[in-house]
Design a protein with these regions (language model features):
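Localized edge beta-strand/strand-to-loop motifs within extracellular or lumenal beta-rich domains
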Residues: 101-119, 168
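Extracellular beta-strand elements of beta-rich domains used
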Residues: 163-165
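Surface-exposed loop/edge segments in extracytoplasmic proteins
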Residues: 72-74, 91-95, 123-128, 170-174
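Extracellular glycan-recognition modules
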Residues: 19-86, 167-172
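Beta-strand-rich, repetitive solenoid scaffolds
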Residues: 4, 66, 76-80, 87, ...
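Short, aromatic/His-centered strand-loop micro-motif at the edge of beta-sheets
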Residues: 84-107
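Enriched but not universal
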Residues: 1-22, 192-215
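Flexible glycan-contacting loops in extracellular carbohydrate-active proteins
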Residues: 127-159
Length: 215
């Protein structure tokens, strides 16, 4: 049986232990070379909700979550221009809400049939018509970066907590950040998906900084 790169499959059985040692507050992309491949290819009807803390807001044209190819572009959590939260779909991008370093927010981005709606802490901050492209991205969404088919994830320094992904109203990923002991008996950070029962490990290089255990 083969497993998706970056994920380890555990079969949920009644009474079986969870495949991690503790849930933690966040993962941090130290060195900007770590990312999680969610395995979800977005299209219209895609939605993502994440608890995030930007640590470097002096950047622009950088991504925290996204997927791209020449046919369709999904930039749900995007720093554009410098120091502002933005989003984009296809050939249109918009940024207006100032990002504050060290401030934790809950960001929700919903791609409806005609609009991209961005909420921060429950309030709509951007809503604009999608234009330029349509259909699926053909590439799966990354957390902590943009999947453009290369190893350059074009991210910025941030912490990410619980993150959920929907497709057409159905919850397809329910990630919580966790730590577990790897085969070298070292503590490793990963995202555990409560929908599939999979542990999604770093698909890049280096290692995530692991936040404190969640109380």
């Amino acid at each position: 049986m083969s497993f998706r790169p970056g994920a380890r499959q555990f079969f949920e059985r009644r009474g079986a232990p969870l495949p991690y040692d503790a849930e933690v507050e966040y993962l941090q992309n130290t060195g900007l070379t770590q990312f999680i491949n969610t395995g979800i290819v977005p299209d219209t009807g895609f939605r993502v909700n994440a608890r995030i803390t930007p640590l470097d807001v002096s950047v622009g044209d950088k991504w925290l979550i996204g997927a791209w190819n020449s046919g369709a572009r999904f930039y749900p959590m995007y720093m554009y221009p410098v120091g502002r939260w933005g989003g984009g779909y296809g050939g249109y991008f918009q940024g207006s809400t100032v990002a504050v370093a060290g401030t934790t927010i809950e960001m929700d981005v919903d791609y409806t049939a005609s609009y991209q709606i961005i909420k921060i802490d429950g309030s709509v901050v951007q809503q604009f018509a999608k234009s330029g492209y349509s259909g699926t991205s053909a590439r799966s969404v990354y957390l902590f970066g943009l999947n453009d088919g290369s190893n350059n994830v074009n991210s910025f320094l941030a912490q990410m907590g619980a993150t959920k992904l929907w497709m057409n109203g159905s919850l397809v990923r329910d990630f919580i950040p966790v730590r577990f002991a790897n085969t070298n008996n070292q503590s490793e950070g990963a995202m555990y998906d409560r929908v599939s029962g999979e542990l999604f490990r770093n698909a890049g290089t280096g290692a995530f900084t692991i936040g404190p255990d969640k109380s």
